Amino acid sequence: MSSTAENGDAVPGKQNEEKTYKKTASSAIKGAIQLGIGYTVGNLTSKPERDVLMQDFYVVESVFLPSEGSNLTPAHHYPDFRFKTYAPLAFRYFRELFGIKPDDYLYSICSEPLIELSNPGASGSLFFLTSDDEFIIKTVQHKEAEFLQKLLPGYYMNLNQNPRTLLPKFYGLYCMQSGGINIRIVVMNNVLPRAMRMHLTYDLKGSTYKRRASRKEREKPNPTFKDLDFLQDMHEGLYFDTETYNALMKTLQRDCRVLESFKIMDYSLLLGIHILDHSLKDKEEEPLQNVPDAKRPGMQKVLYSTAMESIQGPGKSADGIIAENPDTMGGIPAKSHKGEKLLLFMGIIDILQSYRLMKKLEHSWKALVYDGDTVSVHRPSFYADRFLKFMNSRVFKKIQALKASPSKKRCNSIAALKATSQEIVSSISQEWKDEKRDLLTEGQSFSSLDEEALGSRHRPDLVPSTPSLFEAASLATTISSSSLYVGEHYPHDRTTLYSNSKGLPSSSTFTLEEGTIYLTAEPNTLDLQDDASVLDVYL
């Protein structure tokens, strides 16, 4: 093996273990990839730029690279092979859309040996990472490569409409032929940068059937966990500020609808979690390895490649976290249920799955044995809905902000009413005091008072005769066109209208808001002498 490195979430193969894919050594595959891409991209620069046409999506270019070399190709120490490039002009457009220049693309892939990563999935694919952390190179099956070819026109249209997406960004599709074996590879964006240590990594589908990391996976230095592991570790989810949460969910919803329209399913959200509270300890204990300073974060060449760029702009809380730790590499700020500050890196992966006959059969027999709704293989529309529901309810949550303060307009209107309300209070207090004195001196009978109370109870729209109340309330009309709403609800107990035998009327409460006065009645148990508490004004 030419080179390996172990850092962050990148888990390379063991240095003394040579992997094979279709009976071909991984070192030979890596060498052929670099030679083939170096030749085809360099040859493409001589072709003039033009608009992409429909037939460009179906063009396949081929070149033969013998080990002894030719007048067009260099000599090499690998077996003879043929290198095919699919839709070269279309993929050149995709690279330009994301700001990838041909020289940068060649430098990233061909300047240094590729780094082989371990594969936590069940596909058996090989994964290679460029030394500058920019690109992932993955081997794909024939059906996946064929599906990507058919997907390209719609993929082109989607990227034109919205380059900010969590969907995989494909930069090239190639095929190496040697000894009757076809090895197809695709070049994609790297979701989890090695330069940022991932304390936790999850592969989430929204399914619970067999969605727990295996024992073998858990024994790895940097395992990739699954849905059930996430629900156990982060049972209360991950919290975002409102703006970031809305942008993230909007992006996920749009991406899932795009995948559903192409009848794609069985995709996952790859989620890397960097805990900022642990990063200082990590820096003290273990310095960053195998990532040259010139290629450290902040020098990304690819547009829309970071997680934060992919969800349509930063949230409000991003500034605070970036101020504390400027080396965020475009991670999305969040918090755990423990209050830990986090940076999240994410992207949708494994989208080259079409809901064809084999997938339908797979879901059918699994649904017979298990709960069909929990099986990861499902029809595209149901899969998208379940995926979004899981992300929205179990994984990503919005921090509930405190109730907003009143608007400036409301504050001004209340302040304006405050002075008038004081006049209403003093006027009504004095009138009621005089009325109570008159009632006691004139010896008004309790029977007549009961009749008055009874009448008010059957007619809740009526208020005991207090003319001065309306005269005082009319003062509020100088501020705005106020309305007086009256609602008196007397209990069946006759003593509620007057307290004890002193003839004290029930207290009234004014609620002042937006230029309107609401009058409600409550039983009063105050003494006659408590004039200051006769009227409560709530502002």
From Swiss-Prot:
Gene Ontology terms describing biological process: phosphatidylinositol biosynthetic process; phosphatidylinositol metabolic process
Molecular-function annotations in GO: 1-phosphatidylinositol-4-phosphate 5-kinase activity; ATP binding
InterPro entries documented for this protein: PInositol-4-P-4/5-kinase_C_sf, PInositol-4-P-4/5-kinase_core, PInositol-4-P-5-kinase_N, PInositol-4/5-P-5/4-kinase
Biological source species: Mus musculus
Annotated segments matching region Disordered: 1-21
Record's subcellular location: Cytoplasm, Cytosol; Cell membrane; Endomembrane system
Task of the protein: Catalyzes the phosphorylation of phosphatidylinositol 4-phosphate (PtdIns(4)P/PI4P) to form phosphatidylinositol 4,5-bisphosphate (PtdIns(4,5)P2/PIP2), a lipid second messenger that regulates several cellular processes such as signal transduction, vesicle trafficking, actin cytoskeleton dynamics, cell adhesion, and cell motility. PtdIns(4,5)P2 can directly act as a second messenger or can be utilized as a precursor to generate other second messengers: inositol 1,4,5-trisphosphate (IP3), diacylglycerol (DAG) or phosphatidylinositol-3,4,5-trisphosphate (PtdIns(3,4,5)P3/PIP3).
Catalytic activity, reaction form: a 1,2-diacyl-sn-glycero-3-phospho-(1D-myo-inositol 4-phosphate) + ATP = a 1,2-diacyl-sn-glycero-3-phospho-(1D-myo-inositol-4,5-bisphosphate) + ADP + H(+); 1-octadecanoyl-2-(5Z,8Z,11Z,14Z)-eicosatetraenoyl-sn-glycero-3-phospho-1D-myo-inositol 4-phosphate + ATP = 1-octadecanoyl-2-(5Z,8Z,11Z,14Z)-eicosatetraenoyl-sn-glycero-3-phospho-1D-myo-inositol 4,5-bisphosphate + ADP + H(+); 1-octadecanoyl-2-(9Z)-octadecenoyl-sn-glycero-3-phospho-1D-myo-inositol 4-phosphate + ATP = 1-octadecanoyl-2-(9Z)-octadecenoyl-sn-glycero-3-phospho-1D-myo-inositol 4,5-bisphosphate + ADP + H(+); 1-octadecanoyl-2-(9Z)-octadecenoyl-sn-glycero-3-phospho-1D-myo-inositol + ATP = 1-octadecanoyl-2-(9Z)-octadecenoyl-sn-glycero-3-phospho-1D-myo-inositol 5-phosphate + ADP + H(+)
Protein name: Phosphatidylinositol 4-phosphate 5-kinase type-1 beta
UniProt main location, coarse: cytoplasm
Listed PROSITE patterns: PIPK
Residues that bear Phosphoserine: 445, 447-448
